[in-house]
């Protein structure tokens, strides 16, 4: 009887396990799990469609094909449950066991598992110390291996050819040793290994060995050994005696019509194995010749290889259609494998998709859902309500009713969808705002209506985009959708904490038009309908705007006057305003009518000053931000909706449109062009005379045109933004223009100055497909029209833009995927980790300009120590206090230049990150909550703009966006010039010439505070002496941006050394000019070192013998600018190194740059950096490299070898600091980490990544990049093991290393020593603790092989592994501390229980009393 009841039991909770272990299966395990041996290759009988007995689909082994029915039909239905039929041997149970029952194949000879053989490094090879090549020879029957040398002089595991083996047998006798071929022999070898003994041997070997290579190799072997030791796996299990057979339902065979079958590739692969295995058994029974048996064994090995991993060795086995068969490994690997296709992303029920249209009348929390779609999505809910209401009695009748669409159904639908949020999603979902929840509003038609303000977040437009709708079913999911995902709760962007719900396009234009002011308007002639023109000046006649200068007693009066038509929207008026924020008395305020009308929609807590200005897109964004900070979320949502309405309304009333005459071409255009052409001719002449090189000429020409384009654009914008007119009684006057194109660009509604430049200025320089700039610019603009040649030149750029877009989208998506993968387990795990470490943050400056103020960088962070006012010593911010907007203002007012804050990088939490180190949750505006998945947010914030930018490259239409190179520094303030570690010499003209690389100049005020600071280039000419007075706008320094000079510090006579024509130097003849110049070339003779020596003219402290006072080595490619034996003075240029011809900067250079930084790749020509502070001297050359020696004040000098021909940027006798480059080139992040440590590296990475995004005008908060960098720095490399169980060169998690050391130190032993390790994001993802997460990322087979050998346990701590296992993720509401909270739906039970328990006072008795 109990059997029957158990039928209704719920299945076991799928979440009741807490960890998963993977290990190598032993033959016993395989047989134990199997339900029978598959002996025949047959599948099913083609006539009866019943499975063949003992075949691949056998019902006896795998279970019945029909529920509760045996194969021959003797036993049917539930009553015979569990009986085994005596006729056909099939158990009477549900057919679903065919999805879980395994079979097995007993092999006639052992075979090697290809994963352990071929997955590099080969594990079998590592254990036996045989190379993969030899191992394959043995396994595929081309060579013999000695499995037991006994007492012969042969080596264990020695590999030899057949001839040698036979010779040895003759020499030592047949029983003197044992050996063989194929997997059997290898299995014997593996069995013979004593893990403990070998491990001990290797450890001693490692201690004693001197060569680095040997130690590394031994360490690798030890690693595999230790893995086997600790996991309890036996090495011989890597050789298979029997193979498991997958359950048949997982490799189905489906009959098609016409008598054919569609089958899974696995069946073919299994059939091959079974056929070959059976043939081999027969051959062995028949005692066939050795050759034939060997061949058959080899074929069996190949068949098993193909089954496990087809194509890994040799050619892939192809099916009948010439397509390689999909093996077990292929089922797991790649985008369409099990992990990524079915476990990490599934298709779901209760969803639909449709085209979107704009819904301007919706509220922010609503979306329009087509009735048809709602009816389908909410079906079960509708059936339930219909039954509840008594309209129907059965589900069937409810179904009919809904199909007929009776009026009752629509009423019920209205009720069902009330307050039931739905989720809208637009692909590609690049950040979390790509899925948001809305309350549905039923609409006619078939398109989903979307609120215009959320388009930015979805990156949606209405040109045919589609969106998907999903329905949260359970009460919990509805609560989450409403509280966390509702569009009204996602006003701020998680990437930078500024509002993302901001009016755009028409709405901006409307608000901008409302809040503009004007004093005069044009006069239209009643009769002609055209504007009146003043005869004398030829300018249009304007008159005063209606209502200008009127005074009102309050905003309501303004509204009445405006509605009555007495004042104009843009009229400037005076209004008496109450200040609702503070209780000051009302004031008279100068404003415009439009601004007063806009004030009506503001909440009381936002002051009028927030809208008393011209509202462009940026100001509107600030307004929403201000409202969010001053009022609350609800007020902000209401404001956003009102802004939308008022924006659309007044954009409509403004009636702004574009016409050709709006594109005003500047009058000075021809003049600027002629001037530029003349300059180009002049440069050309200089080149023909040989004064400059071709590269310099090209760079200068490009520069002239870039400047001309900028000048024309500037004049055009000035023209557009102002208009001149004639006013009777006033005369000629001008004020800001109401030109439609200018208004659109100025307000930020549509278009950019770049685009207007192309419409009405000149298109400018274009790039070739290779990225170089074509030196003839397009001088026309779109209004004038392009000539055929100009049009042809511009097609390059346009096409490149389209091609880039396609490629970059994929690249950016891949970057995001890697970032998410590396950061997925960075979760807020605790309140405070109690660290005493943090980062020092200061303002970011570039070229003396502050690009990011300290305030923006510390906002939303937590102070590490008390922040004190430098003058009064008061505490501005207490330690561990969140720095909010008010505190930022206090810090900035106090003039602090550096602030210590807590950072994710220095957080001491073991798993995850603590709330204090992270700071503010940018999307919510308060301290971050426990369980927030900050890693994924960081990854999305960095990845999302990547795709945005790459999708947007082509909008400029391929114009080369290149600025004229900066050639001088101008001062921004008055003050006194100060040199900061700057070496200079005074040249013949009396200017200071900069002679070192990291020098800076600063302008200080009377009190000595630095007002501005600039890095100055080597070779720059400083115009003012130190301590000299600086005036604002005065030139401080000048330099040539196209060449890198080599300067002399001494005056004297030039003497060439090793500069031999045809050996180290060649005279390059310029085709065009016929003049030659001396260029250093790479010389075959490594002893030759081209240099220029300066001989003293007497008086200088010269070298006594040679008279040399200075020597300068010349790199390859340097152009010599002085003659031998000529006389020069200090500060003169003796040679020039041309800089690279500039290519256009674009995120196409940017995205790969970001990827390069996060992958921690070594740059191509990276600079060697000094590891210590000290003085520089040159040593003897070695192996064609130059030797630079850095000698510190105390301690050993360090030597660096620098490749010949690279320009060394330090001179003999210079003082260098640790981390300073000794040559030109980009920094290598690994060097920075080694020399300067974690914080400097983090600073470098954050700044570099930010620079790429800043170029594109994308804002990302620093903390996101820090989170990723933290994940890249999680591991350390062991340098010295001490008394720990770690291995040399092992990479372990930092906290594992620390715990291990703590343990050893507590016992009073020697701790291990390690160095920090910087892993690229791909490497870091693959080396996570969880093998499930790593396997689903990349290199699936490799990860699983390693995990199996180690017997790894996955404790399911990250997000990905839990998604794969189908559990709640341990973040957000799935955090383990929240998981145990359950919702009680029926409220009756707990109360009843409570009444039964003792400690509850009985209410009824109390009432009676």
From Swiss-Prot:
Known EC number: 2.7.7.6
Entry keywords, A to Z: DNA-directed RNA polymerase, Magnesium, Metal-binding, Nucleotidyltransferase, Transcription, Transferase, Zinc
Keyword Transcription: yes
UniProt remark on cofactor binding: Binds 1 Mg(2+) ion per subunit.
Residues annotated to bind Mg(2+): 461, 463, 465
Recorded catalytic activity of this chain's protein: RNA(n) + a ribonucleoside 5'-triphosphate = RNA(n+1) + diphosphate
Source organism of the structure: Pelobacter propionicus (strain DSM 2379 / NBRC 103807 / OttBd1)
Single GO MF annotation: zinc ion binding
Superkingdom of the source species: Bacteria
Any one Pfam family match given in the protein's UniProt record, by short name: RNA_pol_Rpb1_4
Cofactor(s) listed in the protein's UniProt record: Mg(2+); Zn(2+)
GO cellular component annotations of the record: DNA-directed RNA polymerase complex
SUPFAM superfamilies: beta and beta-prime subunits of DNA dependent RNA-polymerase
CDD domains linked: RNAP_beta'_C (cd02655), RNAP_beta'_N (cd01609)
InterPro entries: DNA-dir_RpoC_beta_prime, DNA-dir_RpoC_beta_prime_bact, RNA_pol_asu, RNA_pol_N, RNA_pol_Rpb1_1, RNA_pol_Rpb1_3, RNA_pol_Rpb1_3_sf, RNA_pol_Rpb1_4
Lineage of the organism: Bacteria, Pseudomonadati, Thermodesulfobacteriota, Desulfuromonadia, Desulfuromonadales
Subunit structure: The RNAP catalytic core consists of 2 alpha, 1 beta, 1 beta' and 1 omega subunit. When a sigma factor is associated with the core the holoenzyme is formed, which can initiate transcription.
Record: residues binding Zn(2+) 1: 70, 72, 85, 88
Classification via PANTHER family: DNA-DIRECTED RNA POLYMERASE, DNA-DIRECTED RNA POLYMERASE SUBUNIT BETA
Protein known as: DNA-directed RNA polymerase subunit beta'
Ligand binding (Zn(2+) 2): 833, 907, 914, 917
A single BP term in Gene Ontology: DNA-templated transcription
Function summary: DNA-dependent RNA polymerase catalyzes the transcription of DNA into RNA using the four ribonucleoside triphosphates as substrates.
Region (Disordered): 1389-1409
Family assignment from sequence similarity: Belongs to the RNA polymerase beta' chain family.
NCBIfam families per the UniProt record, alphabetical: rpoC_TIGR
């Amino acid at each position: 009887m109990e059997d029957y009841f158990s039928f209704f039991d719920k299945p076991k909770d799928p979440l009741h396990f807490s960890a998963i272990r993977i290990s190598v299966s032993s033959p016993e395990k395989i047989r134990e799990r199997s339900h029978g041996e598959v002996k025949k290759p047959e599948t099913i009988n083609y006539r009866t469609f019943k499975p063949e007995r003992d075949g691949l689909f056998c019902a006896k082994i795998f279970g019945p094909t029909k529920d509760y029915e045996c194969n021959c039909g003797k036993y049917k239905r539930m009553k015979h449950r569990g009986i085994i039929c005596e006729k056909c041997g099939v158990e009477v149970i549900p057919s679903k066991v065919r999805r879980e029952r395994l079979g097995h194949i007993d092999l006639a000879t052992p075979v090697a598992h290809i994963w352990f053989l071929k997955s590099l490094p080969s594990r079998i090879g590592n254990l036996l110390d045989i190379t993969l090549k030899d191992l394959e020879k043995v396994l595929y029957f081309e060579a013999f291996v000695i499995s037991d040398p006994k007492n012969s002089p042969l080596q264990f595991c020695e590999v030899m050819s057949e001839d040698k083996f036979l010779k040895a047998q003759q020499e030592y006798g047949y029983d003197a040793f044992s050996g063989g071929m194929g997997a059997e022999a290898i299995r014997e070898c593996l069995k013979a290994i004593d893990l403990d003994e070998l491990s001990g041997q290797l450890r001693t070997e490692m201690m004693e060995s001197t060569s680095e290579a040997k130690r590394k190799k031994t360490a690798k072997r030890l690693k595999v050994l230790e893995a086997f030791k600790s996991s309890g796996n036996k090495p011989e299990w890597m050789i298979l005696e029997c193979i498991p057979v997958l359950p048949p339902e997982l490799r189905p065979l489906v009959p098609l019509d016409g008598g054919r079958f569609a089958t899974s590739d696995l069946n073919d692969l299994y059939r091959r194995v079974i056929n070959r295995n059976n043939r081999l058994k027969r051959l062995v029974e028949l005692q066939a010749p050795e050759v034939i048996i060997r061949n058959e064994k080899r074929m069996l090995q190949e068949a098993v290889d193909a089954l496990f991993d087809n194509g890994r060795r040799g050619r892939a086995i192809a099916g009948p259609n010439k397509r390689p068969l999909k093996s077990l490994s292929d089922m797991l690997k790649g985008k369409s494998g099990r992990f990524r296709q079915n476990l990490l992303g599934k298709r779901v029920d209760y969803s639909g998709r449709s085209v979107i249209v704009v819904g301007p009348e919706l509220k922010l929390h609503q979306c329009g859902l087509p009735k048809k779609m709602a009816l389908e999505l909410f079906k079960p809910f509708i059936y339930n309500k219909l039954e509840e209401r008594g309209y129907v009695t059965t589900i069937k009748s409810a179904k009919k009713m809904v199909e007929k669409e009776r009026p009752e159904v629509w009423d019920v639908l209205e009720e069902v969808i009330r307050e039931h949020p739905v989720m809208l999603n637009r692909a590609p979902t690049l950040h979390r705002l790509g899925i948001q929840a809305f309350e549905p509003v039923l609409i006619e038609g078939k398109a989903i209506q979307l609120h215009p303000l959320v388009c930015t977040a979805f990156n949606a437009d209405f040109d045919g985009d589609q969106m998907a709708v999903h329905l949260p079913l359970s009460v919990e999911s509805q609560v989450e959708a409403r509280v966390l995902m509702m569009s009204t709760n996602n006003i701020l962007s998680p990437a930078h904490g500024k509002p993302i719900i901001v009016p755009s396009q028409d709405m901006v234009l409307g608000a901008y038009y409302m809040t503009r002011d004007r004093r005069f308007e044009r006069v239209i002639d009643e009769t002609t309908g055209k504007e009146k023109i003043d005869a004398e000046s030829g300018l249009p006649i304007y008159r005063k705007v209606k209502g200008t200068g009127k005074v009102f007693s309050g905003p309501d009066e303004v509204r009445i006057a405006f509605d009555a038509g007495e004042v104009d929207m843009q009229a400037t008026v005076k209004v008496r305003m109450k200040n609702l924020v503070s209780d000051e008395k009302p004031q008279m305020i100068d404003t415009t009518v439009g601004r007063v009308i806009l004030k009506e929609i503001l909440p009381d807590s936002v002051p009028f000053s927030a809208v008393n200005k011209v509202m462009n897109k940026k100001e509107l964004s600030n307004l929403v931000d201000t409202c969010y900070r001053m009022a609350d979320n609800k007020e902000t949502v209401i404001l956003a909706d009102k802004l939308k309405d008022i924006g659309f309304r007044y954009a409509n009333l403004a009636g702004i449109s574009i016409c050709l005459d709006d594109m005003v071409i500047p009058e000075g255009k021809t003049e600027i062009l002629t001037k530029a052409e003349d300059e180009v001719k002049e440069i050309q002449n200089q080149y023909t005379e040989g004064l400059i090189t071709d590269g310099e000429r090209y760079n200068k020409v490009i520069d002239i045109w870039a400047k001309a384009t900028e000048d024309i654009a500037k004049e055009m914008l000035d023209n557009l933004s102002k208009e001149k007119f004639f006013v009777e009684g006033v005369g000629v006057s001008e004020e800001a223009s109401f030109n439609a194109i200018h208004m659109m660009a100025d307000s930020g509604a549509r278009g950019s100055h770049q685009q207007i430049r192309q419409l009405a200025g000149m298109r400018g320089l274009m790039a070739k497909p290779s990225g170089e700039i074509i030196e003839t610019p397009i001088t026309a603009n779109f209004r004038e029209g392009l000539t055929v040649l100009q049009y042809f030149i511009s097609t390059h750029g346009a096409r490149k833009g389209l091609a880039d877009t396609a490629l970059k989208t994929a690249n950016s998506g891949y970057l995001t995927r890697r970032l998410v993968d590396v950061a997925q387990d960075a979760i807020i795990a605790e309140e405070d980790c109690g660290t005493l470490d943090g980062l020092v943050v200061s303002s970011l400056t570039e070229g003396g300009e502050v690009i990011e103020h300290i305030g923006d960088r510390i906002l939303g962070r937590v102070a590490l120590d008390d922040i004190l006012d430098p003058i009064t010593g008061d505490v501005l911010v207490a330690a561990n206090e969140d720095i909010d907007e008010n505190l930022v203002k206090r810090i900035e007012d106090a003039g602090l230049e550096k602030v210590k804050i807590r950072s994710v990088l220095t957080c001491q939490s073991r798993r995850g990150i603590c709330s204090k180190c992270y700071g503010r949750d940018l999307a919510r505006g308060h301290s971050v909550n426990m369980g927030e998945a900050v890693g994924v947010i960081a990854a999305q914030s960095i990845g999302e703009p990547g795709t945005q930018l790459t999708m947007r490259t082509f909008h400029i239409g391929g114009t080369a966006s290149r600025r004229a190179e900066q050639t001088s520094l101008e001062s921004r303030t008055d003050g006194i010039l100060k040199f900061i570690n700057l070496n200079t010499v005074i040249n013949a003209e009396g200017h200071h010439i900069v002679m070192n690389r990291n020098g800076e100049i600063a302008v200080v005020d009377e009190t000595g505070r630095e007002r501005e600071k600039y890095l100055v280039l080597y070779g720059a000419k400083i115009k003012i002496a130190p301590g000299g007075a600086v005036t604002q706008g005065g030139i401080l320094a000048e330099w040539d941006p196209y060449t890198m000079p080599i300067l002399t510090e001494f005056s004297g006579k030039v003497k060439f050394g090793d500069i031999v024509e045809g050996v180290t130097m060649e005279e390059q003849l310029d085709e065009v000019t016929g003049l030659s110049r001396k260029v250093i070339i790479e010389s075959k003779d490594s002893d030759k070192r081209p240099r220029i020596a300066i001989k003293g003219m007497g008086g200088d402290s010269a070298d006594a013998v040679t008279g040399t006072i200075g020597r300068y080595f010349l790199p390859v490619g340097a152009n010599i600018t002085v003659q031998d034996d000529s006389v020069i003075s200090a500060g003169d240029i003796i040679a020039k190194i041309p800089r690279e011809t500039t290519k256009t900067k674009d995120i196409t250079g940017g995205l790969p740059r970001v990827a390069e930084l996060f992958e921690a790749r070594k740059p191509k020509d990276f600079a060697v950096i000094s590891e210590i502070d000290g003085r520089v001297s040159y040593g003897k050359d070695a192996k064609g490299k130059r030797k630079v020696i850095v000698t510190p004040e105390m301690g050993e000098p360090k030597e660096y070898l620098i490749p010949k021909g690279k320009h060394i940027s330090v001179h003999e006798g210079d003082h260098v600091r640790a981390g300073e480059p000794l040559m030109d080139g980009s920094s290598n992040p690994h060097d920075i980490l080694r020399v300067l440590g974690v914080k400097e590296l983090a600073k470098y990475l954050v700044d570099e990544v930010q620079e790429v995004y800043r170029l594109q005008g994308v804002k990302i908060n620093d903390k996101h990049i820090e989170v990723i960098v933290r994940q890249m720095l999680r591991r350390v490399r062991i340098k010295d093991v001490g008394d720990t169980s770690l291995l040399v060169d092992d990479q372990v998690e930092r906290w594992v290393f620390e715990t291990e050391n703590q343990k050893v130190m507590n016992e009073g032993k020697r701790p291990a020593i390690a160095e920090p390790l910087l892993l690229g994001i791909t490497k870091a993802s693959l080396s996570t603790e969880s093998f499930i997460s790593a396997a689903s990322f990349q290199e699936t087979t490799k990860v699983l092989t390693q995990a199996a050998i180690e017997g790894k346990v996955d404790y399911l701590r990250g997000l990905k592994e839990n998604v794969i296992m189908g559990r709640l993720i341990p973040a957000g509401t799935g955090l383990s501390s929240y998981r145990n909270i359950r919702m009680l739906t029926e409220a009756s039970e707990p109360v009843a229980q409570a009444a039964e328990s003792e400690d509850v006072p009985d209410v009824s008795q109390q009432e009676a009393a």
